[in-house]
């Protein structure tokens, strides 16, 4: 009832329909509208129509369908392409175990490259056959054939090593011993000038640990980097610790040794001494000069007694 109402309401919606008055018999009606895209008429459809006609005449007709719903959809869709029957047989052969790409006439990238570009790119190497065959075998959707079985054996761990393309292979790495450089070989020695050493020593005498601000100022003044100034102070502190440690070791060694007695002056031997004559007093020398006088005898006046003269 509802369908009849819609049909009676707007007849212009179905311009090509054949309307019957009695009942709801929709069998003789045909709701096929004219093509709405006339621009697509420029495509070549003659080959597809001819291939369809050939396939219709060659194959047995399918089940009958009411004419009201148009022709049924055919399953042999491959007949619409150029060379429909040959392409269908080729695809069927490829699904049965062969390569569909080879059956349909596709060539490998190497053959296509060599055929279409013989002189434009002579320096490009052609792809290896194993790579091309491996890529084409992935298109095979049917049961595995001999080629697929061989490829599976190559992929298996127990089989041979897989053949990869040239661009997929990793470059061989050289021995690390010839390339690795140790930190000792990369070291370089900074030679400081006399002026730089003098200024650094002054700063070290003032403060053994330089501040960040003073380090920046000193580096800008002396034309050095902050890292060089920092390393110089580190080395200078290490040198000072080494000198102090050496001095402490020397002091410990001196304390461990026993103290030696001071050297005594040499004493003269008794036999080696000589008698030195004592000097004579003036009185003794005068008494000795007068003849007949008794030495050591003085007169009452304390003088020398005159000797008696004999006549």
Swiss-Prot record:
Residues 185-215 are annotated as: Interaction with DNA. GO terms for molecular function: DNA-binding transcription factor activity; DNA-binding transcription repressor activity, RNA polymerase II-specific; methyl-CpG binding; RNA polymerase II cis-regulatory region sequence-specific DNA binding; sequence-specific DNA binding. A motif (4S motif) lies at residues 281-293. The modification Phosphoserine is found at residues 60, 281. Residues 114-124 have a biased composition (Basic residues). Residues 185-244 bind DNA. InterPro entries: Caudal_activation_dom, Caudal_homeobox, HD, HD_metazoa, Homeobox_CS, Homeodomain-like_sf, HTH_motif. GO terms for biological process: anterior/posterior pattern specification; blastocyst development; blood vessel development; endosome to lysosome transport; establishment or maintenance of epithelial cell apical/basal polarity; intestinal epithelial cell differentiation; labyrinthine layer development; negative regulation of transcription by RNA polymerase II. Residues 248-257, 285-298 have a biased composition (Low complexity). The keyword Lipid biosynthesis does not apply. Changing residue 60 to A: Reduced phosphorylation. Does not affect nuclear localization. PROSITE patterns: HOMEOBOX_1, HOMEOBOX_2. Its main location: nucleus. Pfam families: Caudal_act, Homeodomain. In the intestine, detected in ileum and proximal and distal colon (at protein level). In adult small intestine, predominantly localized in crypt and lower villus cells of the epithelium (at protein level). Expressed in the intestine but not detected in other tissues including stomach, liver, kidney, spleen, brain, heart, lung, pancreas, skeletal muscle and testis. Expressed specifically in gut epithelium where it is not restricted to a particular cell lineage. Abundant expression is seen in the proximal colon with slightly lower levels in distal colon. One of its GO terms (cellular component) is nucleoplasm. Can bind DNA as a monomer or homodimer. This is Homeobox protein CDX-2. It comes from Mus musculus (Mouse).
């Amino acid at each position: 009832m509802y369908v009849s109402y819609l049909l009676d309401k707007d007849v212009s919606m179905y311009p090509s329909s054949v309307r019957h008055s009695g009942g709801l018999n929709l069998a003789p009606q045909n709701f096929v509208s004219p093509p709405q895209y006339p621009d697509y008429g420029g495509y070549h459809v003659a080959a597809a129509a001819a291939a369809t006609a050939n396939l219709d005449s060659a194959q047995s007709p399918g089940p009958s369908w009411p004419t009201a719903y148009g022709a049924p959809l055919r399953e042999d869709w491959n007949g619409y392409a150029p060379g429909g029957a040959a392409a269908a047989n080729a695809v069927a052969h490829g699904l049965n175990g062969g390569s569909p790409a080879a059956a349909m006439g596709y060539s490998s990238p190497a053959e296509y490259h060599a055929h279409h570009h013989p002189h434009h790119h002579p320096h490009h190497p052609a792809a290896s056959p194993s790579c091309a065959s491996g890529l084409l075998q992935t298109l095979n959707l049917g049961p595995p054939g001999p080629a697929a079985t061989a490829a599976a054996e190559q992929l298996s761990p127990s089989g041979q090593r897989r053949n990869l393309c040239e661009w997929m292979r990793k470059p061989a790495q050289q021995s690390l011993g010839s390339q690795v450089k140790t930190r000792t070989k990369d070291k370089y020695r900074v030679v400081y000038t006399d002026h730089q050493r003098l200024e650094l020593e002054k700063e070290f005498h003032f403060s053994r640990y330089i501040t960040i601000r003073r380090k920046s100022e000193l580096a800008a003044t002396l034309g050095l980097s902050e890292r060089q100034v920092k390393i110089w102070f580190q080395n200078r502190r290490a040198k000072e610790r080494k000198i102090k440690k050496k001095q402490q070791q020397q002091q410990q060694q001196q304390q461990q040794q026993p103290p030696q007695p001071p050297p005594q002056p040499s004493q003269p031997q008794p036999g080696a001494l000589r008698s030195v004559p004592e000097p004579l007093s003036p009185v003794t020398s005068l008494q000795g000069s007068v003849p007949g006088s008794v030495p050591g005898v003085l007169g009452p006046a304390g003088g020398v007694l005159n000797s008696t003269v004999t006549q």
